Amino acid sequence: MALDIIRYRLHNQLLSQTKYTQPGQVVEQLGAVQSQDYAGAKWALAQRVKDVTTDAAIDKDFNEGKILRTHVMRPTWHFVAPADIRWLLMLTAPRVQAGNAFMYRKLELDKAIIRKSYTVLEKALQGNKQLTRSELGSAFKKAGIAAEGQRLGYFMMSAELDGVICSGARQGRQFTYALLEERVPRVKPLKRDEALAELVRRYFTARGPATLQDFTWWSGLTMADAKKGIELIKSQFVSKMLDDQSYWFADSTSPVHEKSPTAHLLPNYDEYFIGFKDRSAIGKLVSPLHPEENSVALNAHIIIMDGQIVGGWRRTLSKHAVILERKLLTELTRSEERALAREADRYSEFLQLPVEWM
């Protein structure tokens, strides 16, 4: 079953096959894509479209609002589709806000000051303005609200979670914020059970075979929600038992047999890795007997060979090239080295820069 899990997940995660031509379609299929590492998250999307797209092309989609980046789960930034942002926030934001309560108290952010901060944001951003965090910090200061460091960050996160603001276009390397009401046209709202069923459906379609524990880890929702959600959509899914755990996946899935060996240079927060509480299925070469060695190899991005983690990689960008450094957990065969070289060529095409290995 472990090998089946790998084959199904590579297929469902759009790594061994894909029908999508646009990065935004990938975001919608996956439901949400972790993106605090913006550069890595763009590469995660690029690997899941039919034809090689470029870093600049995804920047363009992001700046045009075809892909949004906001706090929605766990809590960290995720890429989400504009049509999904409101029902996702309705479903997941209350849990994140509850988890943030300690920091709100520590930073003296009570309901009154948070409401006042929303008024400041609405006034500063109305008229389709898009401002950086530092510019909005200045707006808070003018309004007599202390907002520096963590305090500013939690003001902004709360406003994202409550659907006041979302991502705007980047200004150079800086992110901006926009009013959600102006950035994203309203669509017919979903009821909570409809939203729950939709999130569960997308999770197990795009990440199955997976367990309910995997879903609760990824979504931040409760086990009660997970069980209710699977009941709502289970006619479209099947489950198989492994080690006394039920693994759910779409009934219609027919995974392809990927050419072996096949390599993937995945970013550190790729959904193939971070989308599961239990990552043991892809970590057969990660030995618990050598934690220091594992840490050195895996403290950046991860190298996948035929679905298994075989090492880690880092990148250093210059104007004329991208320098890649790798740390392996196992020696690669010649055919695996060639597979890795092909993947590096894809990365080169994505960045529009030559790749050099250290």
Residue ranges and their predicted role:
Residues 196-251:
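Active-site-proximal binding-pocket segments
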Residues 1-134, 138-148:
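Phosphate-backbone binding and catalysis cores of DNA-processing enzymes
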Residues 63-72, 76, 160-170, 234-242, ...:
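A short, conserved structural fragment
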Residues 79-85, 171-190, 247-257:
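Short, cationic-aromatic polyanion-contact patches
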Residues 112-129, 192-208, 230:
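Positively charged, polyanion-binding regions of nucleic-acid-associated proteins
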Residues 52-60, 146-158, 223-230:
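Short amphipathic alpha-helical interaction segments
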Residues 285, 292-358:
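Glycine-rich, small/acidic residue-mixed loop/short-helix segments
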